[in-house]
């Protein structure tokens, strides 16, 4: 409980392996919308469209790539 990131690897530059907390200044440690410990800017495509669904895009507020609300 209380983990902010996966503390499996001490080599992760975003996560303190001893505390499982994000390092100072880091917003995220992993995810499709995380790049070099920072959230990717809003609107960047993180998952290409399939069929008639539009592309999924980063929100700028999270490391996760949200499912587009048009997905079935």
From Swiss-Prot:
The UniProt entry, under Gene3D superfamilies, shows: Disintegrin domain (4.10.70.10)
Renumbered to this chain, motif Cell attachment site spans: 50-52
Per its UniProt record, what PROSITE patterns does this chain match? DISINTEGRIN_1 (PS00427), DISINTEGRIN_2 (PS50214)
What SMART domains does the record point to? DISIN
* UniProt keyword annotation of Disulfide bond present: yes
Q: Where is the Disintegrin domain?
A: 1-72
Its biological purpose is as follows: Inhibits fibrinogen interaction with platelets. Acts by binding to alpha-IIb/beta-3 (ITGA2B/ITGB3) on the platelet surface and inhibits aggregation induced by ADP, thrombin, platelet-activating factor and collagen.
Known partners and oligomeric status: Monomer (disintegrin).
Name of the protein described by the UniProt record? Disintegrin basilicin
């Amino acid at each position: 409980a209380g983990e902010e990131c996966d503390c499996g690897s001490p080599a992760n530059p975003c996560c303190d392996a001893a505390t499982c907390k994000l390092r100072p200044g880091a917003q995220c440690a992993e995810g499709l919308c995380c790049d070099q410990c920072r959230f990717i800017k809003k609107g960047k495509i993180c998952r290409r469209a399939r069929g008639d669904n539009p592309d999924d895009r980063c929100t700028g507020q999270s490391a996760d790539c949200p499912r587009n609300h048009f997905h079935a």
